[in-house]
Amino acid sequence: IQSAVGIRRAADAPLFLEQYLDQPVEDALAAAGLGRHPRSAIVELGSLASLSNRASLYLIAAMAAYMQQKGFAVATVTGTRRLRRIFSLFDLDLSTLAAARAERLTGPARDWGSYYDDDPQVLAAPVAHCFEAAVLKATALNVSKRSGVLDSIVAQVKELA
């Protein structure tokens, strides 16, 4: 395993990142200019981990393909400075919805060690933009021609649907 991510549909339960927002995620997205979307079209990514930037690229491409296949319109994530730098390497233009502050949480959820020292932000982007950015970056890096990885990811995601 080179990378992993958790995914939560907004239609299933409140998103963890909604604790950082002053309003429901669908209202925050509309206020940020990302359009009005039903909760069934919104997804939260969490617990992202990768061994390398290349593994992150594959993960982003796979998740974007999966989210498109499942009909999600907007992806949300709480990203630290480091994660935002990784996203910027892939030319992902994310909208900031709010700062993620420990004081917005209650109980054990507040006790994340030094996590909040890395300036986490609640971010969002259209799923179509995420996939396009990942494909463009892979093309620029000549990844897909060397290994066929992106084509393989898309084919595998379609088989899962």
How would you describe each model-predicted region?
Residues R36, Y116, R146-G148:
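Glycine-rich, flexible loop segments associated with nucleotide phosphate handling
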Residues I1-S40, S95, V122, A128-F131, ...:
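A conserved beta-strand-loop-helix scaffold within acyl/acetyltransferase catalytic domains
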